[in-house]
């Protein structure tokens, strides 16, 4: 009897751990159309290892139900294989958030960048919060926390703070790594991993994070039942972006937000009243001038 009880407790603890470990529902694709004459099995193994890493790692101390997992995608396009274990290419990261009381999911994050990394076939990827084991693990862990930060910010004001801080911890460790790759330093350009998390944690971007909460929780989440009220809340949230743009017109985080939401905003405000249309279009063309022609679609009659 005691053995059965112990066995039950062991199974319970293991199953609880697996539930806690599944914050992300991450689909991974590794492609290599430009790489010829290589054993394709290494890319299949890499894809499997990355998917296992993202979906099985315990990223938070919270318990997620299966339906609460955050949907995300990672696509790695290998353009060059340098030696047997070194790769060069691009990585694209996308994440989505379900909208309350609807079947619609809104894009939260969509970004693509260059990446160089080493990977040994059949070697598991293991996250270490106190050191950088490899650039691939660092990049994947960084974006796992960024995805969590973005998601949590939409459910509570600055709710993702601790996850952006964890992403910044990875930036700091990567900077001091003896094998540091590009993308981790302020000197590696103005749009990279360093600047993204710097933006999200810097006080002058508080207005963006306020917008993220208002846009999603008070806007999108109420639109199914109260479309006018939800749309008005979204319009109001955009004023926070205008405030940021006037202070930091080259904000990387603002650019990423607009890239993720541009088409959605057009769809939301096209059926709105003329006065609301005009106000929103004027605001969006100010903060996103290179896409002003796209926003004119909002003014079309429907």
Report each predicted region and the residues it spans.
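Bacterial N-terminal signal peptides
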Residues: 7-16
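Sec/Tat signal peptide C-region and signal peptidase I cleavage site
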Residues: 17-21
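Start-of-domain marker
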Residues: 22-88, 99-101
């Amino acid at each position: 009897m005691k053995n059965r009880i112990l066995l039950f407790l062991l199974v319970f603890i293991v199953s609880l751990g697996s539930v806690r470990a599944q914050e992300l529902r991450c689909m991974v694709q590794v492609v290599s159309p430009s790489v010829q004459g290589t054993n394709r099995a290494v890319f299949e193994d890499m894809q499997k290892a990355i998917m296992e890493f993202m979906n099985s790692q315990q990223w938070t101390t919270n318990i997620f139900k299966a339906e609460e997992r955050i949907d995300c995608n990672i696509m790695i396009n290998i353009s060059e294989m340098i030696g047997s274990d070194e790769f060069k290419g691009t990585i694209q990261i996308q994440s989505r958030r379900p909208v309350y009381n609807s079947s619609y999911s809104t894009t939260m994050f969509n970004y693509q960048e260059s990446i160089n990394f080493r990977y040994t076939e059949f070697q598991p990827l293991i996250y270490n919060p106190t050191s950088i084991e490899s650039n691939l693990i660092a990049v994947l862990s960084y974006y796992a926390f960024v995805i969590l930060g973005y998601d949590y910010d939409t459910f509570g004001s600055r709710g993702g703070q601790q996850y952006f801080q964890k992403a910044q911890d990875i930036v700091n460790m990567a900077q001091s790594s003896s094998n540091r790759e590009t993308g981790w330093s302020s000197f590696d350009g103005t749009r990279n991993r360093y600047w993204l998390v710097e933006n999200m944690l810097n006080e002058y971007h508080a207005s963006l994070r306020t917008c993220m909460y208002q846009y999603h929780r008070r806007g999108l989440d109420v639109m199914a039942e109260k479309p006018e009220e939800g749309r008005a809340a979204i319009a109001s949230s955009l004023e926070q972006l205008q405030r940021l743009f006037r202070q930091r017109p080259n904000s990387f985080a603002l650019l990423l937000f607009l890239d993720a939401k541009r088409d959605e905003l057009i769809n939301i405000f096209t059926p709105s009243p003329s006065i609301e249309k005009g106000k929103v279009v004027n605001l969006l063309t100010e903060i996103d001038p290179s896409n002003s022609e796209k926003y004119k679609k909002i003014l079309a009659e429907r």
